[in-house]
């Protein structure tokens, strides 16, 4: 794990957005037209999952977590800056978790395997081959599990406020049971006192408007029964054995004073993932808010990190090489054998050979000179910012 602490940039250097009104999903956001396309796909057990695609650029898949709503999130002062600013730079794919938002309220028997299966269903429905993953809060563990099981499809992993093990494994069983009981008792009551407990935990530095929106989202995004079942299921999550198998470069960020997921759980997560970068943010909010400096730091860090693969899935240079082919090409230029390249990228030797065949064809080289010519081209290509190699 590579750890560092980041201080907020001075105001003049922060990434900012001019506030504005929102007419709703597909309406005006910050003075610009926002359009998302909501579609449905069917999970293996028949549950219908709602997903949305917006923006353009390299694909970024935000793994689902509880309490989301594809339409309401656009109107929310808690989430709309996430959608706007990430969607400005990427083709942003997100989906409502089973039991939440526009997806079926039937949750079945939720588990890591089920949630990973839902993610598989969504990315296949969208038609993505290779993409970056964003896992926030409970979704971090699912992003880790997917990346470990599908190394050839994940280019980068960004995790915020996440954990590798649920409350059942971190000595917080009593807290979990108390919250589950409170959910069942007060989720839909007219009195907002119960929901205020949640907003105080998740958004301790939120404005009155942000906290009110979040409290309303709790009630509108899912039922009390589904919320309790999903919360309890998250407590049983444990991907500690899968995290060391993640091959994609990974950035882990965590708020220093997070009251929902203690910072030590974020550190543990980063420690378990080989060569992960860990950044501590100066915040107490489990959901980063637009007005706090930590949001600007988060956004700049995520873009710098994903920028190393910003052309993922797009043609690169006149040769039209994909990002994965460029990765193979750079390792060839470092003198690695096909077997070593396969080990570095978590691929089979046969897959590496197929990539090389495609590279040689695009570069119009062949024979013994092919490998040398390809390597020579590699050193001429613009190098992205490098992170420590595995």
Where are these regions (language model features)?
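Basic, Lys/Arg-enriched C-terminal extension of HTH/homeodomain DNA-binding domains
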Residues: 361-390
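Conserved HGGG/HGGXW glycine-rich cap/lid loop of the alpha/beta-hydrolase fold
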Residues: 40-102
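Catalytic active-site module of serine/aspartate enzymes centered on a nucleophile-bearing elbow/loop
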Residues: 276-316
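Conserved acidic catalytic loop of the alpha/beta-hydrolase fold
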Residues: 113-131
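Regulatory hinge/linker segments at domain boundaries
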Residues: 308-330, 385-387
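Helix-rich cap/lid subdomain of alpha/beta-hydrolase
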Residues: 160-216, 220-231
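Conserved hydrolase catalytic core segment
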Residues: 129-171
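Short beta-strand/loop motif that positions the catalytic acidic residue
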Residues: 246, 252-254, 258
């Amino acid at each position: 794990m590579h750890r560092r602490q980041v201080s907020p940039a001075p105001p003049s250097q922060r990434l900012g957005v001019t506030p504005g009104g929102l007419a709703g999903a597909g309406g005006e956001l910050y003075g610009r037209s926002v359009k998302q396309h909501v579609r449905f796909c069917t999970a293996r057990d028949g549950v219908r999952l709602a997903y949305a695609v917006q923006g353009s650029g390299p694909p970024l898949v935000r793994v689902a977590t509880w309490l989301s709503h594809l339409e309401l999130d656009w109107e929310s002062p808690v989430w709309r800056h996430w959608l706007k600013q990430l969607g400005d730079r990427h083709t942003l794919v997100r989906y409502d978790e089973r039991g939440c938002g526009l997806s079926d309220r039937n949750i079945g028997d939720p588990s890591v395997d089920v949630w990973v299966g839902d993610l598989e269903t969504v990315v296949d429905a969208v038609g993505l081959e290779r993409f970056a993953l964003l896992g926030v809060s409970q979704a971090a563990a699912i992003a880790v599990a997917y990346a470990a099981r599908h190394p050839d499809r994940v280019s980068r992993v960004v995790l915020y406020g996440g954990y590798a093990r649920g409350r059942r494994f971190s000595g917080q069983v009593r807290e979990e049971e108390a919250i589950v009981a409170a959910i069942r008792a007060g989720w839909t009551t007219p009195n907002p006192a119960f929901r205020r407990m949640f907003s105080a935990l998740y958004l301790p530095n939120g404005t009155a408007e942000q906290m009110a929106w979040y409290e309303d989202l709790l009630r509108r995004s899912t039922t009390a029964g589904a919320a309790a079942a999903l919360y309890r299921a998250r407590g049983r999550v444990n991907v500690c054995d899968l995290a060391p198998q993640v091959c994609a470069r990974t950035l882990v960020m965590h708020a220093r004073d997070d009251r929902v997921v203690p910072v030590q759980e974020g550190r543990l997560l980063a420690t378990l993932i080989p060569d992960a970068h860990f950044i501590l943010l100066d915040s107490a909010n489990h959901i980063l808010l637009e007005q706090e400096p930590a949001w600007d730091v988060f956004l700049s860090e995520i873009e710098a990190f994903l920028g190393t693969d910003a052309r993922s899935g797009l043609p690169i240079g006149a040769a039209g090489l994909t990002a994965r082919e460029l990765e193979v090409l750079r390792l060839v230029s470092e003198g690695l054998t096909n077997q070593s390249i396969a080990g570095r990228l978590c691929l089979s030797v046969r897959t590496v050979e197929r990539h090389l065949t495609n590279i040689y064809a695009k570069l119009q080289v062949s024979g013994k000179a092919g490998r040398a010519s390809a390597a020579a081209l590699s050193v001429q290509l613009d190098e992205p910012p490098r992170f420590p190699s595995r």
